[in-house]
């Protein structure tokens, strides 16, 4: 069975969404990302990943996979018939990688990471100044289309949905981008995605921030 190390409502939520959308059972290990402890047994998370970051996906052979873009594509490829990622070699596979990279670098690392991790107000303000342009790119792309890539839900949609849900907590109101408001509402109509978010929202209340 796959195992996922996660922190509630962190970027690892996208991996939970992918697993649930794929119908793949997994064992979930909650990590305190501040103390670097695995909460179920108080073990040292650094022994799981030298990066000290979630997600970490433990494969059935014991190998460990990190970084959201890699983890999400791995999960999608376990159930290729579901189309959670275009098949390797298809042109849209590169579009998927394009959007995974964009969300990871331009929204996640450029804004969400400094907003929730940095203590320096100047750094947070600088991140907030830049985020509007990045969000506008996603909003323009999604105007008149239901998904980031092609005509169906992919793991990139799960990753973007997570980031958009957190923007409000970071002081950015997506109401100024109607296409994104519609997109998030559309995504939350998906039973498995909605259930994944609800699970992590409940768990978030049990951990210190």
Give each language-model segment a name.
Residues 32, 113, 180, 200-201:
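Residue-level "edge-of-site" marker
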Residues 70, 179, 192, 198:
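Residue-level recognition of oxygen-bearing side chains
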Residues 18, 76, 163-164, 197:
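Active-site-flanking alpha-helical
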Residues 91, 99-191:
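GST-like fold's C-terminal all-alpha helical module
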Residues 1-126, 139:
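GST-like domain detector, emphasizing the conserved glutathione-binding G-site
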Residues 36-38, 184, 204-205:
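Generic structural signal for helix capping and beta-alpha/helix-loop junctions
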Residues 198-209:
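Terminal-tail/helix-coil boundary detector
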Residues 55-58, 148, 194:
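Short beta-strand(s) of the beta-wing in winged-helix/HTH DNA-binding folds
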